[in-house]
A protein has these predicted regions:
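Extracellular receptor-binding modules and their adjoining Ser/Thr/Gly/Asp/Asn-rich linkers
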Residues: 1-40, 47-100
Length: 100
């Protein structure tokens, strides 16, 4: 049986577009309302809930555990090219986390 949790977080970015895999120094830590059972495999599905800025906000998730995850707005980076300055106004990001 799967266990679900939901939440939302306010995110913005004042940093350049993140282009180095594994570098989560500019990510925001989110803690689940309740920890999932030890040994669980957890997935997180985030969605931007608002439209507060003209640039398209991409979302990056990292380090998902039974107690939380890291997230950041990362504006577009395509085909090896940065297509924006990386800064983005505050948006509301909703998320669903579940065991699988």
């Amino acid at each position: 049986m799967s266990v679900f949790q939901t939440g939302k977080v306010q995110l913005s970015s004042s940093n350049p577009v993140a282009t180095t895999g594994g570098d989560t120094s500019t990510f925001t830590q989110v803690v689940f309302p309740s920890a999932f059972p030890d040994g669980s495999s957890v997935i997180v599905i985030p969605f931007v809930q608002t439209f507060n800025g003209p640039d398209t906000p991409g979302l990056r998730i990292a380090d998902v555990t039974t107690v939380g995850f890291k997230i950041r707005i990362n504006e577009l980076h395509a085909n090896g090219k940065v297509t924006s300055d990386g800064t983005h106004t505050t948006e509301t990001v909703g998320w669903i986390a579940s065991t699988v």
